[in-house]
């Protein structure tokens, strides 16, 4: 038997090796196209962040929410959509239940229209309280609304909240939520009087110290949850090159730490 190594491509001719190479390239392109179709069918992103802004911030996802989303996109390279929770983030803080209902309605809609999109929930300050309600976490002994039905819990890949007032009432979302405890990160700057009980508090610790340290830390946590999630199952068998590993686009960068919020 001839044990000489096979040359896939030579300068003088394109033989079987070249044909195999062309087939391999076409196959890889086809596989990539299939995965792209799964991720972006009907305009659905790879992941989507539903974020509730802090008190007094204009409609949108707020400064902390934007920094969090920017870091998440940078670390994953994924197509990440954004949904700003629609509620009145007033100083009286009477509309958390409205925000929770809006977030829950959107989660249900996404679960129906984009079942392969991994959903991420987030909130800052009063917005964290909105997400507490969605997650079934009461503020003290008081419940302000109905949580997300358990049937939709698997659609949520991760939860990240910042400056959460519930921490002053004796517990964090990550420790109290029956739906999302293990999927959640609840970050409180130790000088933030909104979420921290003790000496050394300054209101600047709530306003100025979550970006970029804590938003980056939260993004790193969420990246791990997104990558740990199940890969969409493709119907039918898809041929795979021997020894090849199918890898989703986007490479996670090392996660730094930092502060800022509202």
Curated annotation (Swiss-Prot):
Keywords: Disulfide bond, Hydrolase, Secreted, Serine esterase, Signal. InterPro entries: AB_hydrolase_fold, Cutinase/axe, CUTINASE_1. It holds the Pfam family Cutinase. It is an enzyme of class 3 (hydrolase). This is Probable carboxylesterase Culp3. GO terms for cellular component: extracellular region. The gene is cut3. It comes from Mycobacterium tuberculosis (strain CDC 1551 / Oshkosh). Its EC number is 3.1.1.-. Residues 1-41 form the signal peptide. The active site is at 125 (nucleophile), 192, 206 (proton donor/acceptor).
